[in-house]
């Protein structure tokens, strides 16, 4: 099975460069997913969205829909269309985001806002029906993970994907949640 992991966290090295925070909770969850998926024989690719140029939706055109409603692409010349098209090549998706202020990260919101606009009403969607695993990583108390996972439920509804697992992770429960992540990577089941 081909699985795409999209993560939405990084540390800024300088004003032009981002690198994944290799000691952070989100990166640790990505590593755990990659390890388990590969152990199960899956072909895995990871894209850190923060390292890409993804601009916010412009709500352009008539009634704010631009060409995304009819053509299922975005007029902006950034990395979004390439990633969106690339998503067609995969059988399942793992979305891993940090939780900031009881919400998914800003880069996740930006990416998913545009993804919904291009794909939610696409009857020929190549994403619809595919399994997703959503992981919300909170460095604080973890109280924002549920709100973040509810936002993923809404995304799942509009994209027509199949929610395979929704996993709240905190600094204090990460070791326990490793087993949950491991089990969630068994995408061939159910």
PLM segments and residue spans:
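N-terminal beta1-alpha1-beta2 submodule of the flavodoxin-like/Rossmannoid cofactor-binding fold
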Residues: 1-97, 101-117, 168, 174-190
């Amino acid at each position: 099975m081909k699985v795409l992991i999209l993560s939405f966290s990084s540390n800024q090295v300088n004003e032009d460069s981002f690198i994944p925070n290799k000691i952070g909770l989100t990166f640790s969850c990505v590593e755990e997913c990659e390890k388990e998926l590969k152990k199960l024989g899956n072909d895995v690719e990871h894209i850190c969205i923060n390292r890409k140029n993804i601009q916010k939706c412009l709500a352009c055109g008539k009634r704010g829909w631009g060409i995304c409603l009819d053509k299922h692409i975005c007029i902006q010349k950034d990395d979004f269309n390439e990633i969106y098209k690339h998503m067609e090549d995969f059988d399942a998706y793992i979305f891993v985001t940090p939780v900031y202020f009881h919400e998914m990260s800003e880069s996740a919101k930006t990416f998913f806002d545009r993804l919904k606009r291009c794909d939610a009403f696409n009857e020929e969607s190549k994403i619809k029906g595919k399994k997703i695993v959503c992981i919300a990583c909170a460095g604080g108390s973890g109280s924002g993970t549920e709100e973040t996972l509810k936002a993923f439920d809404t995304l799942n509804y509009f994209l027509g994907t199949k929610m395979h697992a929704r996993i709240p992770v905190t600094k204090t429960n990460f070791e326990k949640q490793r087993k949950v992540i491991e089990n969630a990577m068994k995408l061939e089941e159910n």
